[in-house]
């Protein structure tokens, strides 16, 4: 018989930098999970990624205090800001443009995000990424 699931925990943790301090410690502690075991496993799986890149993770907590976790792709906004070489999006996205990305950059981001997007093909994924970029005040050339 399958283990009884007691809950899901969704967090965004910088790659390779999981530690017992908030938000990780309290979120896992209230479910009675081993915090250090998670931190070591997460850091081991994310060591190949760019350090500090926020990685969404979904932790499944079981009744016997064990857990599994699934890593997602970095948020599209983080990848877009990195491609446009800016720190934050525009406070008035449709009025003030703060940067621009090319279609090739949007395609690269779409390929990275493809496992987590609901888009049927790459072109639809590129349009999704372009829409996210426009809502941040970033111009997308060629889309």
From Swiss-Prot:
Partners and quaternary state?
A: Part of the ribosomal stalk of the 50S ribosomal subunit. Interacts with L10 and the large rRNA to form the base of the stalk. L10 forms an elongated spine to which L12 dimers bind in a sequential fashion forming a multimeric L10(L12)X complex.
GO MF annotations, alphabetized: large ribosomal subunit rRNA binding; structural constituent of ribosome
What family is it from? Belongs to the universal ribosomal protein uL11 family.
- One GO biological process from the UniProt record? translation
Keywords assigned: Methylation, Ribonucleoprotein, Ribosomal protein, RNA-binding, rRNA-binding
Q: PROSITE patterns given for it?
A: RIBOSOMAL_L11 (PS00359)
What is the protein name given in its UniProt record? Large ribosomal subunit protein uL11
Q: What does this protein do?
A: Forms part of the ribosomal stalk which helps the ribosome interact with GTP-bound translation factors.
Please report a single Pfam family linked to this protein.
Ribosomal_L11_N
GO CC annotation: cytosolic large ribosomal subunit
The lineage is:
Bacteria, Pseudomonadati, Pseudomonadota, Betaproteobacteria, Burkholderiales
The yes or no answer to whether the keyword Secreted is present is no
Q: Does the keyword Protease apply?
A: no
Q: PTM per UniProt?
A: One or more lysine residues are methylated.
Among HAMAP family, the record links this protein to:
Ribosomal_uL11
């Amino acid at each position: 018989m399958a283990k009884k699931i007691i809950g899901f925990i969704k967090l965004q943790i910088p790659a390779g930098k999981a530690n017992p301090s908030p938000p990780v410690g309290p979120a896992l502690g209230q479910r009675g999970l081993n915090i250090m075991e998670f931190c070591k496993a997460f850091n081991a799986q994310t060591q190949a990624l760019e350090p500090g890149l926020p990685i969404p993770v979904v932790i499944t907590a079981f009744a016997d205090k064990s857990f599994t976790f699934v890593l997602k792709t970095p948020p599209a906004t983080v990848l877009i800001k990195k491609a446009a070489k800016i720190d934050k999006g525009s406070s008035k996205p449709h009025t003030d443009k703060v940067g621009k990305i090319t279609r090739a950059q949007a395609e690269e981001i779409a390929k990275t995000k493809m496992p987590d997007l609901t888009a049927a093909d790459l072109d639809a994924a590129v349009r999704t990424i372009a829409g996210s970029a426009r809502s941040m005040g970033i111009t997308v050339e060629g889309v």
